[in-house]
Amino acid sequence: MTALTTGSEAWWQAKNGPERERHQENYRVTFWWRDPAGTQKTSTVKRVWLYVTGVTDHHQNARPQSLERVPDTDVWQWQGKFSPEWRGSYCFIPSDNENDFADAVFEGEQPDRMALREGWRKLLPHAVSDPLNPQSWRGGRGHAVSALEMPEAPVQPGWNHPDTPYNKPVCIDWHSARLKNRRRVWIFTTGDESPERPLAVLLDGQFWAESMPVWPALASLTHEGKLPPAVYVLIDVIDTAHRSRELPCNPDFWLAVQEELLPQVKSMAPFSDRADHTVVAGQSFGGLSSLYAGLNWPQRFGCILSQSGSYWWPHRGAQQDGLLIEQLKAGEKTARGLRIVLEAGRNEPLILRANQAILAELHTQQPVFWRQVDGGHDALCWRGGLTQGLMTLWQPLIQ
């Protein structure tokens, strides 16, 4: 077989995303990006920054990585090492600048964390997904991303059946008197209508409704008998400002959900009032919010699914404990009686440490289902943890 010339049309036609090869205990992965403007003679592109969640991002405090051009071609490439269980999202950020980061990012033993974060914050709105990779979507921060999964990455229940038929969700407008705002809420049901159906409240509902629709996965697992017939309520965050205000330990948000939203939903799709049949699920600030709901209203929210919960809040980067950790230590709150699934990624150090700290406090009061995943602060990891967590929390309801 004749070797294809790097950068030729036939060479590009043979590519369908990153390429991996086994290398001792790990995999060596090569990323490719095709410069639409051609070679260095015709293109103004100086850098193609690679943002791999949990590897080259600000959560790892890693120095920014750029693909390098293969001279006299339209080919840019970068190679890195990944564990066999790794799963995560990535994107490219082509730039006409030689450097888009402050000097402090490249000086000293460690990049300056704030300068690194600020550099990525400015670049990410310009991110593009991998045109060679069919598995692409718009991430939670609004920019395009693509998927990379190693051969031994954990199974993600339900997500391998994207063509499963499902009942169309109903999208309503919730006008909140208490919060003085309005937002979309999706109501999704599986199985036959019954007042005994369990309830799941999913935070960041717009993501699970639109960016990475969860409906086929839930329908598939219900059809297989791995989830009970249920009512799912997906709550939109409105925007970043509302999310940052309403999700971190905000009593008004949860009072509005209980006093206003749930009665409205119940009139359309009856569900059980039992706390031990009710799940609150969230990621990042949503993970923090879900445990906050359970600790403060255990009579209503008895099952908590927290993924990459921001338990450092409100002290980002500080050495002191977050609010919920402090309250548990002081005995101001108790987790007794709650069923809790707690999950965090190895590649999100600040979040992982905060989760380990709150796990230590929760464990003294209550058994906790703890899961540490080989990934970062990443919806591609969360989607499997979401369905697995629902299966775990509702296991007693499966006949």
Enumerate the language-model features and the residues they cover:
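Short glycine-enriched nucleophile-adjacent loop
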Residues: G287-P298
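Aromatic-rich carbohydrate-binding modules that target alpha-glucans
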Residues: T2, Q24-E85, S95-N160
